[in-house]
Amino acid sequence: MIRMALKPLVAACLLASLSTAPQAAPSPYSTLVVFGDSLSDAGQFPDPAGPAGSTSRFTNRVGPTYQNGSGEIFGPTAPMLLGNQLGIAPGDLAASTSPVNAQQGIADGNNWAVGGYRTDQIYDSITAANGSLIERDNTLLRSRDGYLVDRARQGLGADPNALYYITGGGNDFLQGRILNDVQAQQAAGRLVDSVQALQQAGARYIVVWLLPDLGLTPATFGGPLQPFASQLSGTFNAELTAQLSQAGANVIPLNIPLLLKEGMANPASFGLAADQNLIGTCFSGNGCTMNPTYGINGSTPDPSKLLFNDSVHPTITGQRLIADYTYSLLSAPWELTLLPEMAHGTLRAYQDELRSQWQADWENWQNVGQWRGFVGGGGQRLDFDSQDSAASGDGNGYNLTLGGSYRIDEAWRAGVAAGFYRQKLEAGAKDSDYRMNSYMASAFVQYQENRWWADAALTGGYLDYDDLKRKFALGGGERSEKGDTNGHLWAFSARLGYDIAQQADSPWHLSPFVSADYARVEVDGYSEKGASATALDYDDQKRSSKRLGAGLQGKYAFGSDTQLFAEYAHEREYEDDTQDLTMSLNSLPGNRFTLEGYTPQDHLNRVSLGFSQKLAPELSLRGGYNWRKGEDDTQQSVSLALSLDF
């Protein structure tokens, strides 16, 4: 009875510990499936020193006392924190084969990592019958078929929409299975075998840890085994990355050894104590020297200030650092695939500016053989709502547009225009900052006769992304990665309409029309500056837009000097596939991977309102407001322009 009463309390405590990591809006993965060892174990083993019904994890307890028997559970491991950030169902983040959960009737989760597992056992937990074994003191507590065997029994392969997550290799060292370079390479190969088994079964996204430098852990630091452990860790990782680059799988590698070195070199940036020996001491004192200040029995117990809980396992702070690191890589394309959308948004604002000018001139062209020039300025705002694989963003900017047209005869005129646009976008949970300058030029032609009218424009542009700053949480701090790149665009647009008004000099005009638009934006690939564990290199991005639309435009003249005009159009986008972005860590250039990002809107509504006021016989003032709305995007712009006949 007591055990059953405490079960909800234990679950609530664990959920509370997870909730400290804010859940992000994008949620591109159906679930998170984890394989590995104690670094990822979500609670396969019972916790005899914890609350009834609790399970053990290889990190510190949540506090405030951190002591065994205190009623405090163990904190979450990195994949549990990551899953919470990705919006994965909490039950999916639980252990796969926990005897405690089975006894209590709690459904098994998707975390198959087991403390103590070697690379061969990790492979079995994926591929073997009875491959998931929970044993303590040579006693089998529970067994299950491996993940793929269990899925096959249900007629399923690997979930192609899931994120897979693998750690391993440390126990091959700790259990004496790696004593030389050849054995280190063989262990790395076994981990790659696990990756390939998942890939061949249909897995599309697989996160793989590089092994931490075992020479930089309390277990070996400062002792005679430190150089040996560091050397073999390096051999393992070199073989792992080499084989992964040839495995044919889409692998997101985590450069954990580099990340931890950065944390040790600048601990304050990660919220760690800068005045403590973070490698030679630990929190619990289990197999290592307890930190005298922040250790469990120190003067001020606080595991958040330390990297290691025991001789080889991170504190919750270390686990959160790794979760944030992984999330920063997975979320990068959610923001970076918005760069082409900044350009598309700017192009649409520029085209709206031209169309507003044309609408003000409708049935009111300059005389044959005469020029009409215009110059205008304005501002625009572009808002993106979050999607499954795209971040929310808020953009704003300003512009200068100028151009002119020449009337060839009664029915035709042609012209040119140019525009400069400055755009800024803040995106993601930490308001990453992306800035772009656009330089565009157009040639256009217009026709109006016998109530029919048409226009067509060809536009080209140069894009200067001069300040790109990706920001993200990292442990107890925040980091940004900077870069810059260029791009270009070209577009063609055309409209055809029929004026319902029977006379050209009618005070009102109303016209249905159809439209066709094509645009292509290309953003050059670039590398973020530096070679930190979080810096990325991105491939080129290309995003085309093909739209057909129909609408209604009208205008009304109040006398000979003042007119109001308006337009509504609905457009269908035919290039609406989710965008992919291929990238790699700067520190691991040979291991490229591809992730999903922004999905273009398949339907758009557009409204424009404006006025034109004649100031002198050859001089007019025009103002306008434009609004575009898709399912997840909103774009608005305002403008003011002068036109002069000469």
Curated annotation (Swiss-Prot):
Keyword hit for Membrane: yes
Pfam families: Autotransporter (PF03797), Lipase_GDSL (PF00657)
Positions annotated as active site in the UniProt record: 38, 310, 313
Domain Autotransporter: 366-646
Regions crossing the membrane: 398-408, 411-421, 438-447, 452-461, 489-500, 508-518, 548-558, 562-571, 606-615, 619-628, 637-646
Molecular-function GO terms, alphabetical: carboxylesterase activity; carboxylic ester hydrolase activity; lipase activity
Keywords: Cell outer membrane, Hydrolase, Membrane, Serine esterase, Signal, Transmembrane, Transmembrane beta strand
Segments on the Periplasmic side according to the record's topology features: 409-410, 448-451, 501-507, 559-561, 616-618
Membrane topology: Multi-pass membrane protein
Domain notes: Contains a C-terminal autotransporter domain that integrates into the outer membrane and enables the translocation of the catalytic N-terminal domain to the bacterial cell surface.
Protein name (record): Esterase EstA
UniProt gene name: estA
